[in-house]
Amino acid sequence: MPKYYDKLLRKLQKRPLSQNEFSSLLCELGGLLVEPQIELEIIKTSGIPLLFAHNKVYLRTTLTPYLQESFCIVDIETNGHNPYIHQPIEIGAIHYQNGEIKETFHSFIFCQNIPQKITEITGITNSMLQDSPKIHQVLESFKLFLKDSIFVAHNVDFDFNFLSNACYCNHFGYLYNPRLCTIKLAQKTLQSPKYSLGFLNDFLGIHHHTLHRALEDSKITLEIFKKCLKQLDKNIYTSYDLLKFTNSKSILQGNLNEN
């Protein structure tokens, strides 16, 4: 994913910006021909969680208690491992906020090339996808579901980068949502010899029976996420605190740090 908005995000992580500062930064990012209002509308659809109040622009995650934050727990199945030559074939997602599941999302995606190995892992066949909606339609619906929630997944870079690249290739732009990896968070909060989704499913007593299907795997990920949140220190209060803690290099003492 390009780092187009990185400078903007770094500044907003440190402090809110005045409207004038924010507009000037948009012009700096976009060049001489940029229209700040148009650039703002693009940013709003990119997943960056902005908050406008009292003539200032805030990064919402720096203010929102994580217990009130909007999280989107995501899992995908794909027809290969390379986001530049393969595609998502199934998306499952859960909107989780205030300790409740607000809504779920699930869709297959039309594809004519499912390798036998992928069918063996997921059970998804070419025939199952022949009447499914095209990828552009599914991604449009998914972006409306995701909005500016924090994107949560087990090994988040895989799911996020796959979907972000697919969005870009289908003219929706890259995703810039904050992202949280439940492998990293679990390594800092849960004592376990391994951290794969399948292992934690059994080790933590979740016991969902279906693996390698998008919505079911997102349900397992949510249960892992909830167990992690219960172990957080009280000094972790905002969503930004949670993201910073998750991405820190420390791990829970005694863990073997295996995936």
Pin down the residues of each PLM region:
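Acidic, divalent-metal-coordinating active-site segment for phosphoryl/phosphodiester hydrolysis
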Residues: R213-K226
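N-terminal accessory regions of nucleic-acid-interacting proteins
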Residues: M1-E69
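Short alpha-helix plus adjacent loop in nuclease-associated cores
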Residues: R179-S196
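Short, glycine/acidic-enriched loop or turn micro-motifs at the edges of active sites
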Residues: T78-G80, K184, I220
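Acidic two-metal-ion nuclease catalytic site recognized across multiple nuclease folds
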Residues: P2-Y5, K11, P16-L17, E21, ...
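Active-site catalytic microenvironments for nucleophilic, acid-base chemistry
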Residues: A166-C169, K188, F203, K227-Q231
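Conserved non-catalytic scaffold segment of RNase H-like nuclease domains
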Residues: L59-R60, E69-S164, Y176, Q191, ...
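Ordered, small/hydrophobic-rich secondary-structure cores
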Residues: M1-S24, F160-K184
